[in-house]
Amino acid sequence: VAPSRGLGDVYKRQVVMSLLGHDFDSYWTKTETYEALKKYIQMDMYHLKALVTQLISGSHIKINPDKFQNDMSTFASVDDIFTLLVHLGYLTYDFENQTVSIPNQEVQKEFINCIEDGGWEPVMDAIRNSEALLWATIDGKEEYVAQMIEQVHQENISILKYNDENSMSCVLSLAYYAARKDYVMYRELAGGKGFADIVFVPRKYRDVPAIVVELKWDKSSDAAIAQIKKKEYMQSLKDYHGEVILVGINYDNTDSVKDDYKRHSCRIERIKL
């Protein structure tokens, strides 16, 4: 837009046509500095692969921004790289908790573009298969859901701690990446008598059911469902009315030599609110 004396505002014809035609997309400007940072990410400097995977899954990463020396080309630590990404607008900074996260889906797409090539196949496979996993969950296909989560978990062992609850939550957020289109995803959402591990709240005007996920270690997927009901985690959906899918996922840490042994199991139930 540009001011014009006595004529009000003057707009570019191309912009007006895009607005009238509802033609919108992400046109994120890439800078030379970001291209340089991308090399560090792709080379896994300072264990950036695991950290970027966590960011893409929706995690918040703690950093120390005070060490940054305003040097746009020399990086001594992951703190320097993430602090510069904050300055460039690719990450947002939480002053209270001193953490960084990806601010929106537009920037999230840029991080995915950054990792699409060069040894990130397990992460990309999880993202590509995430829509199929989401609909399998909605359709109640328990065995398929358990199988897909097991695959994502095993293929990302090298960049995530396997036997760690936060890691499992990260894996699930990555495995359900496509859900962000229709849902707002919350981890450890307060509701009832505790905190639900992951809650999928439908966005406005989306015709999809809400989803509540509970994770268990060395117990059972039935126990996970029982905990959702006992602690009334559905109360975290206080403004929601409709169908809710309860998903219990258990990780079995015991060893077995059986050929058909699976570490992950899944139970899915449906209720109405």
What is each of the regions a protein language model found here?
Residues 1-7, 11:
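Single conserved hydrophobic/aromatic residue that forms the stacking wall/gate
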Residues 16-226, 230, 243, 257-273:
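Extended alpha-helical interface modules used as scaffolds for assembling large macromolecular complexes
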Residues 234-241:
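Arginine/glycine-rich "motif VI" loop of SF2 helicases in the C-terminal RecA-like domain
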Residues 246-248:
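Conserved beta-strand scaffold positions in the cores of enzyme catalytic domains, especially
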Residues 250-257:
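Short, conserved secondary-structure transition motifs
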